[in-house]
Amino acid sequence: MMTRVECFNPHRWIILHVAIIIQSKANAQSFSPSPPDLQTGHTPSKTTVFAVLVTLFFLTGLLSVYIRHCARSNPDSSTRYFRNRANDGSSRRGGLDNAVVESFPVFAYSSVKESKIGSKDLECAICLNELEDHETVRLLPICNHLFHIDCIDTWLYSHATCPVCRSNLTAKSNKPGDEDDGVPLAAMRDHVVVDIETVEVAKSHHRRLSSEISGKFPRSNSTGHSMDRFSDGTERFTLRLPDDVKMRLMAVKGRRLKRTRSFDVDLTAEHYCRSGEESSNTIGSGAKSGRVNWPDRWGLTLFVSKSNSGSVRSQKSNGEPLK
């Protein structure tokens, strides 16, 4: 039996090798990594947009820092803005009307400093600064709290309550002596009586009450604060005046009072020495009263009467010295 021997065919081997090479190249192309731009997903357009956004963010930060720096260098600018908006008579955002705000009395703090009840210095509850003599202040008659005019006007632009006690400032006060619209301004100027004896009694009573409270409530070990200081928390913002002085303030409400000798009554020895010549005609041996002629800017003549009641009276005169 003869064995069949197949002949070697080189054409088949060539075709097989070519097919293997082509298959290997196809597999290599399918598994080759993509270009960097396609792999990361970044394109030149996206890079430009990102750079623009970063630049805008940086410029916005610089602008905010610049605006804050300008606001700190000129702190009164915001106050002027709110005051101008308030004076326009436009609609307020939850605040009081312009007419209501102007009805609250405005005056110099020096005009009531000597007449106030209590020896402690007053502070503004909004800025927490001590009130100076030359500063203009505004009084809230309902609660007797005193503020700088710029501070309280800015507050009342968006609020209708007192910043200290939260009293509703839109409600009219019915307390006697707070406001008397029936009394004309001319009548109030003609006759003003300040009872010094009442003021002194009130001051002594206030000092005695403070000493009693501080004696009954010693320093607390748990809080480190005394009860006297706690009870006096709002007193440093409260202006307490005699009824007559407060009536005079309400009579000229909404107007800035100038410092006048007829209102700033100061019974000191210096005033008596300066006016000794005018009072020499009225003070004699055994006399119980002495009058000092002090003409003021309102055309009033102020004289001091040292009587048993201890009162100081101001009456209108025609400018002639009293005899």
Swiss-Prot record:
The keyword Ribonucleoprotein does not apply. It comes from the Eukaryota. GO terms for molecular function: transferase activity; zinc ion binding. It is a single-pass membrane protein. Residues 210-229 are annotated as: Disordered. It is found in: Membrane. Keywords: Membrane, Metal-binding, Signal, Transferase, Transmembrane, Transmembrane helix, Ubl conjugation pathway, Zinc, Zinc-finger. It holds the Pfam family zf-RING_2. This is RING-H2 finger protein ATL32. The lineage of its organism: Eukaryota, Viridiplantae, Streptophyta, Embryophyta, Tracheophyta.
